[in-house]
């Protein structure tokens, strides 16, 4: 994309993959965690991306819009970025689109679950590592280092816009595809 945060790094296996079918390999789209905050980046998932490629599975390590002081309520940009990255993945050469997966950690796990529920093209598997499965509970528990990450990402409290919070809440939007919660 045009913005500095709109990029993804593709990690392909160097050698022939044991998972290869018709010249294509499965791929995992990686979504990092970090309370949806700008200070946390896709560098968090780089070791996993490298390990996946070494094991014979491609990795699509994405970046997306995160909030920062003075630039909050960015949830729509975040979701737009991850949806576009998911769509772009289907266009990459040598990727087996039938075996594409999503993996996210913490707030990235939240985004992975939400993407799996909302995307037209369903992932073969969604892996959510220590995900935020209930945004409203996370907000009530003051999840994050400063206790307000979810409401700053969304831009309001659950009381101010309960419908929006339900739409962004994985527990209210179950995915119709295989899910592995770790």
Language-model regions, residue ranges each:
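Short beta-strand element of the alpha/beta-hydrolase
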Residues: 23-33
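Short beta-strand/loop motif that positions the catalytic acidic residue
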Residues: 181-182
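Active-site loop signature of alpha/beta-hydrolase-fold enzymes
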Residues: 30, 36-37, 67, 134
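Primarily recognizes the serine-hydrolase "nucleophile elbow" in alpha/beta-hydrolase
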Residues: 84-143
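A fold-wide structural signal in alpha/beta-hydrolase
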Residues: 27, 53-63
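Catalytic nucleophile-loop/oxyanion-hole region of alpha/beta-hydrolase
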Residues: 39-49, 60-97
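N-terminal cap/lid segment of alpha/beta-hydrolase-fold proteins
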Residues: 1-21
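Mobile cap/lid helix-loop segments that gate and shape the active-site cleft of serine hydrolases
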Residues: 137-171
